[in-house]
Amino acid sequence: MTPIFDFGFGFVPAHRHPNGGGWVADTARVADTAYIGPAARVFGAALVRDNAVVADNAVVTDYAWVSGNAQVSGKAWVSGNAVVAENAQVYGNASVTDNARVYGNAWVGCDAKVSGNARVSGNAEVTKH
């Protein structure tokens, strides 16, 4: 029998990721080289690849991508068609949604929300306290 997990939207077939032990829906794609922490969740059709990290209570869902050496941590939420790539970090209670992109060495943290078609790149830091 396939394990199921409730990601907050009902139970779906899921499994624990071998690198970190976090929950990954069977519909999501996560590389073995990525780290999914024990309380982190990846579901929907999300993609986490390369050496990306999803830690703490962070969530990556829908069609979102996290790649490269990017990190999503705290209670951060990455969803929609959002992309977090390269060495970018999303942390705290921040969210990156819709078609937003965070890449380069950019940081999005605290309670910041990046959405729509926004781009955060280079060494930019977006926070809201």
Residue ranges: model-predicted function:
Residues M1-Y63, S67-N69, K75:
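Extended, small-residue-rich solenoid/repeat segments and analogous flexible loops
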Residues I4, G122-H129:
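Intrinsically disordered, low-complexity terminal regions
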Residues G44-N123:
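Thr-biased low-complexity repeat/linker tracts and other Thr-enriched repetitive architectures
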